[in-house]
Amino acid sequence: MQHIRNFSIIAHIDHGKSTLADRLIHRCGGLAEREMSAQVLDSMDIERERGITIKAQTASLQYKSQDGTVYNLNLIDTPGHVDFSYEVSRSLSACEGALLVVDASQGVEAQTVANCYTAIELGMEVLPVLNKMDLPQADPEAARQEVEDVIGIDASEAVLASAKTGMGIDEILESIVARVPPPKGDPSAPLQALIIDSWFDNYVGVVMLVRIVNGVLKPKDKILLMASHATHLCEQIGVFTPKSQPRPELSAGEVGFVIAGIKELEHAKVGDTITLAGKPAAEPLPGFKEVKPQVFAGLYPVESSEYDQLRDSLEKLKLNDAALMFEPEVSQALGFGFRCGFLGLLHMEIVQERLEREFDMDIITTAPSVVYEVEQRDGTVVTIESPSRMPEIAKIADIREPIVKVTLFMPQEYVGPVMTLCNNKRGVQLNMSYHGRQVHLTYEIPLAEIVLDFFDKLKSVSRGYASMDYEFVEYRSADVVKVDLLINGDRVDALAMIAHRNNARYRAREVVSRMRGLIPRQMFDVAIQAAIGAEVIARENVKALRKNVLAKCYGGDISRKKKLLEKQKAGKKRMKQVGSVEIPQEAFLAILQVEDK
């Protein structure tokens, strides 16, 4: 065990984490030259294209250090994005050390800080690495100062590296061997293994990525998953180099994979503890928690006949994505579909994109909403995931909305616009500090405001320089109301939205006027209204198309013309009673694009 080193890499999006991982694998001979592809560990297409890591991946590398000892290095690649922060904390808790990769030309960013604090709380050894030193604008001194100011760790020994050219790779490996402590654990104690990640393989079922903390695991052992209380027979174990290689056993301190013929990803939850069914451990490893979706949206197939296909696609995605939740939902406007829960906006976009790309689905997505807690007059508390499920106003005693703590980093020239944006989003400033040129702001903002378009707005007011990270704080009472949209007097459930009372009228007027341009003209007038309860707060009309019925009358008596006009009027009236209005897809998106004042 003295020769094992478990480490992970912490970095902001695009700071060169996956490239550095490729270099380390290459240097230790994990893959032959011909098998090296860019970003070896990012196995999903969408991960490569967006340049982000979504699932944790590992590589066990053999490294011969300069004094001739051979070390077994386990690299655990972690996701870097806020939505996946639970996966990050589990990946980090499997390691004793972390490489903090900072782009020498850009300095420290928000997500790096959040993950780095997690690592420090877990008591890990953090080794700073200043990457991208091959760029002409790299400024190692400023970056080093920033690491010390913002994160508060000593960066005097930071390795200067460039993953692109391969500079500094040997120094990184040497410092891992020298500074990261070997794992602690007792091979003779009862088995305790932490599930770092799990995914579904079409051939063998669920593959679990585990870190053995105590004990030894061998094939043919009967294992027990402590959170879901399921027992399975362990069929195959091994390590990734990043290719899978079977092993006769995994013992304390090692990282590898376990295949046990599990069919449901539900059973192998990230963060759960595996132990032996015959000789179980007294208690599971600390830190396991159920991941709760924060953002909900309705997904509907464009063709209603594709409902079953959508369900199958979602089930397949769920095999690899335990945080995705969905349940059937019926909407009068859109037919049958699903109400889906996501960890955050990036997660939602990725699920949509994977549905369209991997399963070839055409889907309509309704406006994302967050979960509200509604206390009713009879004292019961219900959680509302969709605006259409909000109880009647008369029954509601109090509505509480989720508040998140947002950490923002930006160059100081953008502080003004960013603060204005946060205040417009009903934010409350908690803290502000200067670190060199960078400013660190902390705000509490309702999650509902972030879900709509906060991230896009933040990028535009700061010209792309600001970065953000958020975490859930609590539910707080809020003065929010449900705004219904009516088309010709019929409520359209899929278009309902929940808004803050101060913004409700403004948003209602905006949506209604935008809808007016999107609903095609009919043979009769179409009234578009927005209402809070029974009170209509905004209205627009889509004027009817009319045929000129008098065109065939040359001269003639006025009564003849009157008769034709009356006949047309009666026809229109009859049409209006039976006519239904097709609502185009753009109309649903109109709700998303309404700017708040």
UniProtKB/Swiss-Prot annotation:
Looking up InterPro entries in the UniProt record yields: EF-4, EFG_III/V, EFG_V-like, EFTu-like_2, G_TR_CS, LepA_C_sf, LepA_CTD, LepA_IV
Using the UniProt record, give the first listed, main subcellular location.
Answer: membrane
Which keywords appear in this protein's UniProt record, sorted alphabetically? Cell inner membrane, Cell membrane, GTP-binding, Hydrolase, Membrane, Nucleotide-binding, Protein biosynthesis
Q: What region holds the tr-type G domain?
A: 2-184
Show the SUPFAM superfamilies listed in the entry. EF-G C-terminal domain-like, P-loop containing nucleoside triphosphate hydrolases, Translation proteins
Function, as annotated, reads: Required for accurate and efficient protein synthesis under certain stress conditions. May act as a fidelity factor of the translation reaction, by catalyzing a one-codon backward translocation of tRNAs on improperly translocated ribosomes. Back-translocation proceeds from a post-translocation (POST) complex to a pre-translocation (PRE) complex, thus giving elongation factor G a second chance to translocate the tRNAs correctly. Binds to ribosomes in a GTP-dependent manner.
What name does UniProt use for this protein? Elongation factor 4
The organism is Bordetella pertussis (strain Tohama I / ATCC BAA-589 / NCTC 13251)
By which gene is this protein encoded?
lepA
